[in-house]
UniProtKB/Swiss-Prot annotation:
Attaches a formyl group to the free amino group of methionyl-tRNA(fMet). The formyl group appears to play a dual role in the initiator identity of N-formylmethionyl-tRNA by promoting its recognition by IF2 and preventing the misappropriation of this tRNA by the elongation apparatus. The gene is fmt. It comes from the Bacteria. This is Methionyl-tRNA formyltransferase. (6S)-5,6,7,8-tetrahydrofolate binds at residues 112-115. It catalyses: L-methionyl-tRNA(fMet) + (6R)-10-formyltetrahydrofolate = N-formyl-L-methionyl-tRNA(fMet) + (6S)-5,6,7,8-tetrahydrofolate + H(+). One of its GO terms (molecular function) is methionyl-tRNA formyltransferase activity. It comes from Legionella pneumophila (strain Paris). Keywords: Protein biosynthesis, Transferase. InterPro entries: Fmt (IPR005794), Formyl_trans_C (IPR005793), Formyl_transf_N (IPR002376), Formyl_transf_N_sf (IPR036477), Formyl_transferase-like_C_sf (IPR011034), GART_AS (IPR001555), Met-tRNA-FMT_C (IPR044135), Met-tRNA-FMT_N (IPR041711). Belongs to the Fmt family. PANTHER family: METHIONYL-TRNA FORMYLTRANSFERASE, METHIONYL-TRNA FORMYLTRANSFERASE, MITOCHONDRIAL. NCBIfam families: fmt. Its EC number is 2.1.2.9. PROSITE patterns: GART.
Length: 314
């Protein structure tokens, strides 16, 4: 079996475990593609992506085209003569001309069990919709949105305490073995492809900040899922008077309530109990504007009184 010349394309932290594995494998990681540096933070200073930082630390050449609409960027990739391109959360659309450059094509590590949750936010949508399991799919890329033939899947349970952050970390780590297995299969010309059933496809649209506001007229379970799906970003919130109150952790209870959804039923060391469309939700960790995340217990001990029984959260 021949060693493969690999080009990697990715931007956020999700791809780092696979990069660590690639550089220790028998294959040759020739270059890394990542999105251009972006302004970030209060100072709006240019910030390198986690993938770029990794590549610099490992002395791997980095390429950061704005897109692949110009021929120069396409020619630059072609000159690397990759056998395969591994794409993980790159964030740029790859046109047909790019997909055809690697001898064995471009393969994508996608954070869902395709064809369920094609699109930009599969992890958040798995939690939002109460999926019992999630996983990663290694697929051959085509010009569609996560529509290509599948090479490998790995599954894991989604627990009742999983947040988008914890599920992200689990899937990032578990993607390593299936990726290496697929590379070995490609190198030995033994890869097997399974077409996706488009009739089973669901789409995970991009999550935005406007969706983060809690609707207390939903059920306690639905609100709990939203809080977990929107942690660590953009973080679900409600209005306590005129203050934005971010909710980082909560759980649905079996306590029935006939009060108006959004009414605070009780605040004690266990948390803040809030009425919903059915059972009450126990809010455990909160964050006021300009303050740190704090448990309701610690907030109570600080002597503050903005949250109290009878308060209507909006």
């Amino acid at each position: 079996m021949n060693d493969l010349t690999v080009v990697f394309a990715g931007t956020p932290e999700f791809g780092l475990p696979c990069l660590d594995a690639l550089i220790q494998s028998r294959h040759h990681l020739k270059a890394v593609y990542t999105q251009p540096d972006r302004p970030a933070g209060r100072g709006r200073k240019l910030q390198e992506s986690p993938v770029k930082e990794w590549a610099i630390n490992h002395q791997i050449p980095v390429y950061q085209p704005l897109n692949f609409k110009n021929q120069e960027a396409v020619d630059e990739l072609s000159a690397l003569k990759p056998d395969v391109m591994v794409v993980i959360a790159y964030g740029l659309i790859l046109p047909k001309a790019v997909l055809e450059i690697p001898r064995l094509g471009c393969i994508n590590v996608h954070a869902s069990l395709l064809p369920r949750w094609r699109g930009a936010s599969p992890i958040q949508h798995a939690i939002l919709h109460g999926d019992a399991e999630s996983g990663v799919t290694i697929m051959q890329m085509d010009v569609g949105l996560d529509t290509g033939p599948m090479l490998c899947k790995a599954t894991c349970p989604v627990t009742s305490s999983d947040t988008a952050g914890s599920l992200h970390d689990k899937l990032a780590k578990m993607s390593v073995k299936p990726l290496l297995d697929v590379l070995e299969a490609l190198a030995s010309n033994s890869a097997q492809f399974e077409l996706q059933n488009n009739e089973l496809a669901t789409y995970a649209g991009k999550i935005n900040k406007e969706e983060a506001r809690i609707n207390w007229h939903q059920s306690a379970v639905e609100i709990d899922r939203k809080i977990r799906a929107f942690n660590p970003w953009p973080v679900a919130y409600t209005l306590a008077g005129e203050l934005m109150l971010r909710i980082h952790q909560a759980k649905a209870t079996d306590i029935m309530s006939t009060e108006m959804p959004g009414m605070v039923l009780n605040v004690d060391k266990n948390g803040m109990l809030v009425a919903t469309n059915d059972n009450a939700l126990l809010v455990e960790k909160i964050q006021f504007p300009g303050a740190k995340v704090i448990s309701v217990r610690d907030w109570l001990n600080s002597g503050k009184t903005q949250l109290h029984t009878g308060l209507m959260l909006q």
